């Protein structure tokens, strides 16, 4: 089943995949974590949020879901605590035309659930005391038990099947009162309200309080009708039409964040230019954790055949300026950049910068500072969960401001981190970048992009449309050991 679902999702070319109740092991969870389409998750119950159990898996799930919805404020609050994010409350949905009010009988409809046996017995006692009333016990699932009905009440107490909407509508349209079972189906109570029944909730209440409330409503027609009118008004706001409109708004909003589909084939605006290999992420000795000089870096890049490099030191810009100056008489393209540490949302690289950007600003402020210089926003290693990264809310909120997403970083410990970035870039049709994140010469070029030669930021973005990601990984342990040795030597000096 799982394999068939994954195959269908891969071949379907869907714009949006919408899963319901993914907080339990289900095909919805599989679909949302497998597809490359835009994803929406709807939570229907605060009691169905236990999966996945580990924080790491919940974070991965959250990163793959683009919009979180809930059908009640209670469920939204519980899901937000579990999955960390803003949830939109949408209607549960009810067919107001099918579940429309009709002529009422003196009948109490009670949801029949194992957890509600006490409610069933209590309502049976009330019907016995009020001879003009009938009781209908409605089951929407196969019965695992059968309540005992006293012989003297069998003309007024009936068990009714409510497996289909039509069956439930017939029962609820005639009922004057509906009593929900503790932990029962929220939709059934909504259908009862739409059908004009006065609804009595039992969840979290003492049985004697419920019995007292129902007893009062049986003898007070005006109170019962007022309760029914209030419920009907609420049910009309929860219609399927309203739900469809809200979901359409969510889908359109998500689709609006995605870049326009680029044409394939011969669409190469820089087709007359030569191909070069460009490493878009590396460091010099201006970074606190690197001892490679800009001069050595340029010589090595030339020696291994790179056509371009981006100097992206940590929170400093001097190394990039030095490299640009040293490269003036070389054919090697040097992009001046900086890897800027935000306050608490990871790092953002600015490419084609003119001046240094201070660390410690918010993600939004950092992106704005890059934009003010006419720079390009390049997001490095966005899913490297072993380091500080943007949380899913920040990533989704600012996706339209990301010019290039790094889908391959040669220094990441796990391939899955790069795979996650590639999935995200494909979903939103972002331009893809790659870099070595080299801190030693031996790492330079282990991640790069094959692209057309460019001369300015605009041509750089045009060239990335037809670029190819190059993966040339070397042992991370080997590269890390070289970095540590170089740092120790620097300290000894």
Functional labels for PLM-detected ranges:
Residues 102-130, 136:
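Conserved donor-binding/catalytic core segment of Leloir-type glycosyltransferases
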Residues 15-18, 23, 28-49, 69:
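Active-site proximal beta-strand in glycosyltransferases
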Residues 221-258:
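A charged, aromatic-enriched C-terminal amphipathic alpha-helix characteristic of glycosyltransferases
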Residues 173-184, 197:
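Acidic donor-binding loop of glycosyltransferase active sites
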Residues 145-167:
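Nucleotide-activated donor-binding/catalytic signature segment of Leloir-type glycosyltransferases, i.e.
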Residues 74, 93:
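Carbohydrate-associated surface elements
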Residues 33, 46-68, 75:
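Membrane-proximal helix-turn-helix segments that form the acceptor-binding/catalytic region
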Residues 259-299, 304, 317-357, 361, ...:
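Charged catalytic cores and adjacent phosphate/nucleic-acid-binding surfaces used
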């Amino acid at each position: 089943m799982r394999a068939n679902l994954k195959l269908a999702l891969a071949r379907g070319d869907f714009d949006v995949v919408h899963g319901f109740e993914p907080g339990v092991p289900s095909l919805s969870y599989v679909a949302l974590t497998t597809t490359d389409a835009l994803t929406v998750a709807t939570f229907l119950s605060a009691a169905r949020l236990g999966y996945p159990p580990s924080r790491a898996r919940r974070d991965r799930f959250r990163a793959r879901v683009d919009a979180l919805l809930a059908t009640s404020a209670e469920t939204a609050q519980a899901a937000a605590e579990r999955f960390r994010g803003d949830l939109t409350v949408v209607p549960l949905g009810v067919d107001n035309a099918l579940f429309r009010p009709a002529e009422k009988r003196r009948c109490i409809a009670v949801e029949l659930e194992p957890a509600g046996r006490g409610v069933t017995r209590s309502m049976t006692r009330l019907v016995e005391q009020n001879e003009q009333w009938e009781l209908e016990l409605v089951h929407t699932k196969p019965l695992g038990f059968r309540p005992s009905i006293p012989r003297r009440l069998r003309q007024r107490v009936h068990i009714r099947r409510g497996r289909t909407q039509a069956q439930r509508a017939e029962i609820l349209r005639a009922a004057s009162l509906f009593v929900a079972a503790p932990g029962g189906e929220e939709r059934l109570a909504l259908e009862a309200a739409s059908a004009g029944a006065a609804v009595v909730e039992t969840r979290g209440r003492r049985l004697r309080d419920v019995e007292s409330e129902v007893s009062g409503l049986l003898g007070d027609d005006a109170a019962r009708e007022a309760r029914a009118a209030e419920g009907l008004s609420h049910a009309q706001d929860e219609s399927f039409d309203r739900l469809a409109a809200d979901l359409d708004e969510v889908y359109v909003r998500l689709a609006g964040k995605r870049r326009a589909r680029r044409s394939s084939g011969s669409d190469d605006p820089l087709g007359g230019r030569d191909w070069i290999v460009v490493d878009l992420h590396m460091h010099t000795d201006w970074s606190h954790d690197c001892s490679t000089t800009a001069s050595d870096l340029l010589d090595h890049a030339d020696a291994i055949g790179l056509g371009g490099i981006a100097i992206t030191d940590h929170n400093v810009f001097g190394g990039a300026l030095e490299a640009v100056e040293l490269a003036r008489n070389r054919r090697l393209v040097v992009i001046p950049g900086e890897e800027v540490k935000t306050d608490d949302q990871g790092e953002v690289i600015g490419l084609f910068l003119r001046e240094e950007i201070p660390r410690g600003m918010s993600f939004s402020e950092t992106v704005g500072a890059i934009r003010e210089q006419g720079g390009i926003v390049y997001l490095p290693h966005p899913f490297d969960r072993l380091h500080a990264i943007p949380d899913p809310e920040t990533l989704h909120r600012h996706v339209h401001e990301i010019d290039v997403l790094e889908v391959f970083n040669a220094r990441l410990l796990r391939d899955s981190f790069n795979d996650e970035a590639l999935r995200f870039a494909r979903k939103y049709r972002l331009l893809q970048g790659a870099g070595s994140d080299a801190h030693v010469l031996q790492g330079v070029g282990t991640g790069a992009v094959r692209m057309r030669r460019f001369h300015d930021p605009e041509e750089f973005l045009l060239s990335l449309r037809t670029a190819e990601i190059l993966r040339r990984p070397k042992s991370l342990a080997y590269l890390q050991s070289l970095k540590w040795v170089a740092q120790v030597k620097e300290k000894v000096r």
